[in-house]
Amino acid sequence: TPLVEALLRAQGYVFAPEPFSPFCRRLLAEPRPLGSSLAAFFGYIYIQDRSSMLPPLALNPAPGAAVLDMCASPGSKTGLLAQLVGREGLVLGNEPARPRLANLRRNLAALNLLQAVTCSWPGESLPLPDASWDAVLLDPPCSGWGTTDKNPQAIKRWQGDRLKPMLELQRKLLTEASRLLRPGGKLVYSTCTTNVDENEGQVRFAVEGLGLEPIPLEPFPGFVFAAPELPGCEGTLRVDEDASNAQGFYIALLRKPGDSAAVPGLARGTAATAAYRAIPPAFLAEFGLSPALLPPGDLAVFEDSLHFLPAPALAHLPAAVRWQGMALGKASAQGLIPSVRLRALLDPEPQRIPRLDVDDV
């Protein structure tokens, strides 16, 4: 947005638009590491390799859609998906590895994405109903052969018998993704490896073994793509890392056959998260926050933390799923201490908020 670009320029950063998405910019010069910028601190930007932006753009979920990100941490793809579905939609970011879950939640909270919720389950056995998601992004654990600039030992490390459990896990995850996808729904399978067994080989498994239909992808401008390495995988994208000045990446778009009519969500009341104490939205106004900026949903206190629970999640997720909405701050009997990065609910009447003009300091 113009505000974010102005904030970056004010700190001396130079950047240019990327041709493949209006959401993306390429950094050209930085007076200090971009991660230390105000724009990064307040979650206006997310720093990532340009290739990793492509899977959510290839999935391209509709506004208001229900989207599952099966292996979500650190959250860059989850965040972009949440931007695409908007505040009326839902993105569930599942991170099977508990140590990585905190990082996912921290990043999504910094981005102020109220429509994104998180959980932690084995990706191959999620406690979710069949055919319940409009779109699924599966970016599974992989050998990382496309990241040799950062991980030079990746190709040497992941060979032969050591790779077999990874291939088996990827197929289990694809099978689960197919189960969860509604008829007519779309699946993006992506990896940051150049290994054909993990890429084209798995796409052929999805088509021949699971009955999914390939959807040819149009090449994204600004990238160079190598030809797929197996027949039947035409229309999948293999990023040429050297020619594209980006990580090696593979992206395939698949569709589940059947009627494309949306599968209705669960009736409210049949879905729930852990027991919580509901808080009236007007509570926020006492702390310079605007309840009117909340999308439909509930405010809830879990122990000493105030979270937002979006209505689509309350309606869509069954009771068996333990999930968490975005943390807004710390709550106690004395009131609320909003998160220092919370901007999604800032009062639109700024004169009501105490402030310090740094130009006068």
Regions found by a protein language model. Name each.
Residues 1-11, 247, 257-361:
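Polybasic, low-complexity RNA-engagement segments
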Residues 1-32:
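A short N-terminal interaction module
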Residues 64-73, 92:
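Conserved class I S-adenosyl-L-methionine
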Residues 74-87:
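Conserved SAM-binding loop of SAM-dependent methyltransferases across substrates and taxa
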Residues 85-86, 181-183:
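Helix-to-beta-strand junctions that scaffold the AdoMet/dcAdoMet cofactor pocket
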Residues 94-130, 138:
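S-adenosyl-L-methionine
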Residues 99, 135-176, 192-200, 215, ...:
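Mobile active-site "lid"/loop adjacent to the S-adenosyl-L-methionine
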Residues 186-191:
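Conserved beta-strand signature within the Rossmann-like core of class I S-adenosyl-L-methionine
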